[in-house]
Amino acid sequence: MLTPMLARLRRRYPEAEIVMTVSRGQLPLYAPRPYGVVALAYDSRDPRSAKQLLELDPFDLALVPGDNRHAMLAHALGSRWVIALADARPGWKSRLADELVPVPAEPTALSDMFALLAGAQDDAVFEPDDWPRPESAPFELPQSDYVVLHVDAGSPLRFWQPHKWLKVADALASKGLEVVFCTGPGEEHMVEAIDPERRYQSYAGILDLPQLWQLLERARLLVCLDSGASHLAKLARTPSVVLYGPGSPVLFGPGRFWRGHPYRAVTIADFPCRDQKMVFKSEMNWVRRCQRTPRECPAPACMHAIDVEAVLASCGELLR
C-alpha cells in the first residue's frame, strides 16, 4: 500500500536516506532494500522498538500514512517537518503535524492517497526492478501450470463460502491447471473445510512472505479475498481476481501506480449495507465500505452474494 509513496519519495530525493517502520512480519520483504529504503520493525506495544527509533538521528521529513496519532511519534523523533492527511478525527491526532494534505474529493486508491504525502500526483507506474523478490527458504513448488486460491483474510466478514471455493477449484482444474490452496499461519482449518478429501495441494499456514511471493510469482493466476495476498501479488506481478464484500475495490485496488497490473475485482456494486464513509476515522463522501464487526454482522451477505460464475468469468479473462 505504501509503495507509490516510497517511489515518489525516491524520485524527489534521490540521495536521501529513507527509513520506514514496518511490522516485524513484513520486515523480510524489505531485505532487498526497495527504493533504497531502510526498514525497521516497529510495534507500538513494544517499548524496545520505540527505543530503537529514538536512538536515530532526527529526520528532516516525516510522513504519516494512516492514523495521524503516529504524528506524535514523528514529533518525538525530532522530525523537522511532519506531513499527514487532513480531516482526521479526533482533531488532537493532527496537532503535531506541520502540514496536512487534503484528502482527494474524487475516488482514489488508498495507495495513491498515501503517495500524496510525498508530493503531487504524477504518472509514474511500478517498475519491477525497483523491488526485487527477497531470498526465500527452499520449498517444493508445483511442477505444472498452476493457480493459487488464497482463501483467508483479516476478518471473517470477508470470507467466502467453502463450497464456492471448491467449485472454483474444480472448474480451474478441469482446464488442465494445477490448483493449490493457501492461507496464512493458523488458518489451515479453512482449507480443510473447503477440501476435506485433500484433492488439491495445500500450502496453508506453511509459507512465510518471501516464499508466498515466490509461489505467486510463478502462478498463472491468483484468486483471493481483499487481503494482504492481493497486495503482494502486485509486487509479484501475478494476474489476480480479488473478491470484495465489505471492502472497496476503489480504495484497495490497483489505482494509478499499479494500473499495469492484470487484475479483476469481483463485487456486488452498491450493496445496501456497504454504506460507511470512514477511512482512518476521516469521512470521505465518495467512500463506500463496511467496517462492521462480526458482532454487528453475524453473516456477510455481501460476500455470500458473490457467485461462482462471476469469479470464473474473471478468471477466464485473465487466463486467455
Where are these regions (language model features)?
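Catalytic machinery of carbohydrate-active enzymes
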Residues: 1-320
